């Protein structure tokens, strides 16, 4: 490869990435998932598109996709809170194992019938498309305001269900090559090995990387690179030992994100940009890899297979996998069934048969790509609508315009939050002394018309003021309400109820004041928080609702899996 060719590749790559970034701004306006835009640009640049670029280097695509997945999952793990694991670890692992087996089996049997394949080849297609995709889930769920139980279950499921799909794919390829039709007992051993090594090396490698980052003094710009290289090393070593590298790198990121770590905010900001670059690069390459003209002959059976998986296989797997977990409402189960987002992982798994030289490998790849397109276009575009219909959305708390960590020490939790006040903010016109600031927070600076003010307690806030507030992450909900817009309060009342009560209030007192219906089944000395928690039957999340004693009780605030505040409204008005 000469210098001219290398420069041409640089130009081509930069043009494609730039176009992807610029066109991504249209995704929200058009209601199209941003990943579809990245994929479409790759297809347009490919052999059947305007670019006409011939690309069929499957090993290179496999390399780029795995590297990108490692970066995306490392970033996703860092952003997963430990509280999410307490709420959703059991259900997510059930869906990542039993759920994938059921989805793959049902989809595989349908594929064998639709494409006139033998049962083993059909099951291979089912295994390829059987798992949800972490990149798609993290990208499309962000900013939707889902309750914690639903969002955590979907995110942890997407980060942990790939080992089962990868193992099923590799096992079925081997069985097809050796003309086997029955599984051996080694199947179970290999599954345990995949999950076991992924968990062990992921947690152990994350802990070792954390200690290294906190112990060694480096220029601030090198900490993100050390975290990135360490995460990729965990991914690579686990994969080389026949474990799940995808699960390992996700858990490695989880350890880094939930323990005190030096230069946390610099690492997170760098990872955010790298994760976007990884998604763009991965979907561009996968878009280049497909030949759209090959999708037309299989369009009808592939569409039927997609609909079967969306409306039959996925819901059956979800309802079966969540049977032991009574904390999920019917609406939550239906919504989780709908969010079976497929993305890069099925396409990457479809490369395995190509590299193994299976006779119908091209068909497997084209079917997987078609299923991914249908999933992103159909399920991805209706995600917001489905969440509202299922009532799994909770009112969003106002967020700061920006936040910067005060990296004085790894154990230091303090941050600076920046809020800009628009006309619809409640606090506009209020004096600083009248603001009910959360304990241990301070207004560090006030800017007005680009000038630094020297405020006093009598200074009144105006539209356009910029406030710099020192606080901690736990203060964000209270600060968000303080600096939130006026309209959402009406939404809060409609969602949580007209009355927000402290969870430590005695149930007997509340029953007397509000004249509740028959409550003989309840210990009158218990608090309303204890009563609601018992009725939920699982770790509570904001937005949990139970109907009891003629009222709807809604968890309005919680801390460390303990209910702090509860909304109350008449049950007959709950669906308005």
Swiss-Prot record:
Q: Which reaction is catalysed here?
A: K(+)(in) + H(+)(out) = K(+)(out) + H(+)(in)
Protein's name in the database: K(+)/H(+) antiporter NhaP2
Where does this protein chiefly localize? Answer: membrane
SUPFAM superfamilies (alphabetical): FAD-binding/transporter-associated domain-like, TrkA C-terminal domain-like
| Membrane topology type | Multi-pass membrane protein
GO BP of this protein:
cell volume homeostasis
- Can you name a GO cellular component term? plasma membrane
Keywords noted in UniProt = Antiport, Cell inner membrane, Cell membrane, Ion transport, Membrane, Potassium, Potassium transport, Transmembrane, Transmembrane helix, Transport
GO molecular function terms attached to this record: flavin adenine dinucleotide binding; potassium:proton antiporter activity
Q: Which organism is it from?
A: Cronobacter sakazakii (strain ATCC BAA-894)
Among SMART domains, the record links this protein to:
CorC_HlyC
Where does it live in the cell? Cell inner membrane
């Amino acid at each position: 490869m000469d210098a001219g060719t290398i420069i041409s590749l640089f130009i081509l790559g930069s043009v494609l990435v730039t176009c992807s970034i610029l066109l991504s701004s249209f995704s929200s306006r058009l209601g199209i998932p941003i990943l579809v835009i990245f994929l479409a640009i790759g297809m347009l640049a490919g052999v059947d598109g305007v670019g006409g670029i011939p690309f069929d280097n499957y090993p290179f695509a496999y390399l780029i996709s795995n590297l990108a997945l490692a970066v995306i999952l490392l970033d996703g793990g860092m952003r997963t809170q430990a509280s999410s694991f307490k709420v959703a670890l059991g259900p997510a692992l059930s869906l990542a194992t039993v759920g994938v087996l059921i989805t793959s089996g049902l989809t595989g049997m349908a594929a064998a019938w639709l494409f006139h394949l033998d049962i083993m080849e059909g099951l291979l297609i089912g295994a390829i498309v059987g798992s949800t995709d972490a990149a798609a889930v993290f990208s499309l769920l962000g900013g939707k305001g889902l309750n914690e139980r639903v969002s955590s279950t979907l995110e942890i499921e997407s980060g942990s269900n790939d080992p089962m799909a990868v193992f099923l794919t590799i096992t079925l390829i081997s069985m097809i090559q050796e003309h086997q039709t029955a599984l051996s007992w080694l199947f179970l051993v290999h599954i345990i090995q995949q999950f076991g090594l992924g968990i062990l090396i992921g947690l152990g490698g994350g802990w070792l990387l954390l200690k290294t980052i906190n112990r060694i003094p480096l220029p601030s710009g090198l900490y993100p690179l050390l975290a990135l290289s360490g995460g990729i090393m965990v991914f690579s070593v686990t994969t080389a030992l026949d474990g799940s590298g995808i699960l390992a790198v996700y858990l490695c990121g989880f350890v880094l994100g939930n323990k005190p770590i030096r230069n946390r905010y610099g690492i997170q900001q760098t990872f955010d940009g790298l994760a976007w670059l990884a998604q763009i690069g991965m979907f561009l390459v996968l878009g280049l890899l497909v030949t759209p003209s090959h999708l037309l002959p299989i369009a009808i059976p592939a569409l039927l297979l997609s609909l079967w998986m969306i409306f039959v296989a996925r819901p059956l797997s979800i309802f079966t996998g969540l049977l032991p977990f009574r904390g999920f409402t019917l609406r939550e189960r239906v919504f989780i069934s709908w969010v079976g987002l497929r993305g890069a992982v099925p396409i990457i798994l479809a490369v395995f048969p190509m590299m193994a030289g299976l006779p119908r490998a091209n068909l497997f790849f084209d079917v997987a790509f078609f299923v991914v397109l249908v999933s992103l276009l159909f399920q991805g575009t209706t995600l917001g609508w489905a969440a509202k219909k299922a009532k799994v959305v909770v009112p969003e708390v106002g967020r700061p315009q920006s936040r910067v960590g005060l990296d004085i020490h790894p154990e230091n939790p303090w941050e600076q939050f920046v809020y800009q006040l628009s006309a619809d903010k409640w606090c506009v016109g209020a004096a600083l002394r009248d603001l009910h600031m959360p304990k241990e927070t301070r207004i560090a600076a006030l800017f007005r018309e680009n000038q630094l003010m020297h405020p006093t307690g009598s200074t009144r806030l105006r539209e356009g003021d910029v406030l710099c507030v020192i606080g901690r992450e736990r203060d964000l909900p209270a600060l968000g309400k303080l600096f939130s817009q006026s309209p959402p309060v009406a939404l809060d009342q409609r969602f949580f109820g007209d009355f927000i009560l402290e969870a430590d209030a005695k149930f007997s007192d509340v029953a007397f004041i509000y004249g509740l219906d028959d409550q003989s089944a309840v210990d009158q000395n218990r608090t309303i928080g204890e009563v609601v928690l018992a009725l939920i039957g699982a770790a509570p999340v904001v937005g949990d609702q139970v109907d009891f004693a003629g009222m709807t009780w809604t968890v309005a605030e919680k801390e460390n899996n303990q209910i702090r505040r509860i909304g109350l409204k008449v049950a007959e008005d709950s669906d308005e």
